[in-house]
Regions:
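Long, low-complexity, compositionally biased intrinsically disordered regions
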Residues: 1-206
Length: 206
């Protein structure tokens, strides 16, 4: 599970353990909750069935102990983000990405092993927006991370960044990948790997 505690200082983590969340309600991609015996409320935006953005009405700058209390609640109630188990055809996704990569093997590849990013860009954008999004909706979080890491390798190629279509694909990649680095459904090692791949892409100015 995502190591959320690094966001908080030890004082706030300790204070959070004395708090109780009540009236916890999930509706679509939003969770609301009250802090018992107080006027403070929590609102949580969800992305890929995982907490993504947390807002507290205490107006403290940075992360507060009320938000930490929510994370403790998540640890105690994993059913809040339980993902239905669906059969996922991993070969389909790997084969589709291979097909897209293969489509970039033009004349330059034959002689210099340089992929033509322009020939792949449209298909890569669709792969991220449709295939990987569908995969995430089906609970294939780890596979999605591995696929995004491979997409980042294509984006980080020194010849790819010269393409006029590079920015649009890179932006789609980042919008999909960023939330996964803080997902409760993947471990720290995989999140760290994906975060490094994001850095490889964003160094070019996304």
């Amino acid at each position: 599970m995502y190591n959320w505690k690094y966001q908080f200082n030890q004082k706030d983590l300790k204070k959070a353990q004395d708090l109780t969340l009540v009236n916890v309600e999930r509706k679509d991609d939003t969770i609301t909750a009250d802090i018992k015996d107080s006027e403070f409320k929590i609102e949580v935006q969800i992305k890929y069935n995982s907490p993504y953005y947390i807002l507290c009405n205490c107006n403290q700058k940075g992360s507060c102990h009320h938000e930490a209390a929510f994370w403790y609640y998540v640890e105690e109630h994993p059913e809040l983000f339980k993902t239905p188990q669906k059969d996922i055809d991993e070969d389909y996704y790997y084969n589709e990405l291979y097909r897209i990569t293969d489509s970039g093997k033009g004349q330059d590849y034959q002689y210099h092993e340089i992929l033509d990013f322009d020939r792949m860009a449209g298909s890569l954008s669709r792969f991220i927006a449709e295939d990987i999004e569908n995969l995430l909706n089906d609970g294939g979080y780890k596979l999605a991370c591995e696929l995004l890491c491979r997409v980042s390798d294509l984006l980080s190629d020194e010849y790819a960044v010269d393409s006029d279509m590079w920015y649009d694909v890179a932006e789609a990649f980042c919008q999909c990948a960023y939330p996964l680095t803080e997902s409760i459904h993947i471990d720290d090692d995989l999140a760290g790997k994906l975060d490094g791949k994001i850095s490889d892409v964003t160094q070019y100015g996304v």
